Regions:
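Sec-dependent N-terminal signal peptides
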Residues: 4-12
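Carbohydrate-interacting regions of secretory-pathway proteins
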Residues: 17-250
Length: 250
């Protein structure tokens, strides 16, 4: 019997036809990234190896993640969780100002996130202690979506809500363009061709956002302009996929 890929199963289980207008916007957005000067973009993940990535705190990648159909999948959690570990994927390099182009997919009820400014140090047992997060979520089936729009896909987690919900259903690929620019004090998220979230990166406005969030008492949260990028393992028995990851440093 031919092996059926997990991505195909997810697509068949959760997929549905997208409206042509929305699909066109996503395709156009990815096409625009591809057409820009090759020298401006660095491929962070080419779909064939773990080059440029490792698991936070040095845990073994393949205990929880696998490579399939050009994507990295967090899909071995039931075995990996025996020791209560989390397997957050982190870049080898650090970045300051950048645009990140990344596709992501979740199964039903899944929760993840994309963090930046992460300091990898043994005194921080989790990347979210230092790194702010753009939420990756199944808005329909995960209970955190009911805790307010600052907890939904595309939000600057617990601080800024997306202006609208343009996320695709579980089992379909979404595309983020995440801009982080400390020099111009601008951060933003474009989801599937629509700019949905904008936020400051520093100054009084940033401090006010943090002060009104669950991170108010976290001394190191959002303090580091330069740091690593993390794809979160939220600690649940879920399937998360990421692919076509590129970065343009500003």
């Amino acid at each position: 019997m031919k092996k059926i890929s997990l991505l195909l199963i997810l697509a068949l289980t959760f997929g549905c036809k997208e409206k042509p207008k929305k699909e066109s916007a996503v395709e156009q957005e990815i096409s625009n990234v591809s057409k820009e000067k090759e020298s401006e973009w660095t491929i962070l993940f080419d779909g064939t190896s773990w080059d440029g990535w490792h698991v936070y705190s040095g845990r073994e990648i393949e205990k929880a993640w696998s490579l399939e159909d050009g994507a990295m999948l967090l899909n071995k959690i039931s075995e990996a969780r025996k020791d209560g570990e989390r397997f957050n994927m982190v870049t080898d390099k650090e970045y300051t100002n950048f645009v990140l182009s990344i596709e992501w997919m979740v199964n039903s009820g899944a929760n993840s996130g994309i963090m930046w400014g992460v300091v990898e140090d043994e005194k921080y047992n989790e990347p979210y202690i230092t790194g702010p997060e753009i939420q990756v979520l199944d808005n329909v089936a995960h209970p955190d979506a009911k805790n307010g729009t600052t907890h939904q896909a595309g939000a600057l987690y617990d601080m800024v809500s997306p202006a609208q919900d343009v996320v695709k259903p579980a089992g379909e690929w979404n595309h983020y363009l995440i801009t982080i620019n400390h020099d111009t004090n601008e951060g933003s998220v474009v989801l599937n061709g629509t700019k949905i979230t904008e936020f400051p990166m520093n100054g009084e406005a940033w401090d006010d956002m943090v002060a009104n969030s669950e991170f108010a008492t976290w001394e190191e949260f959002g303090k580091h302009k330069t740091g690593k990028i993390v794809l979160q393992d939220h600690g649940e028995p879920i399937v998360i996929g990421y692919r076509n990851i590129k970065i343009k440093e500003l």
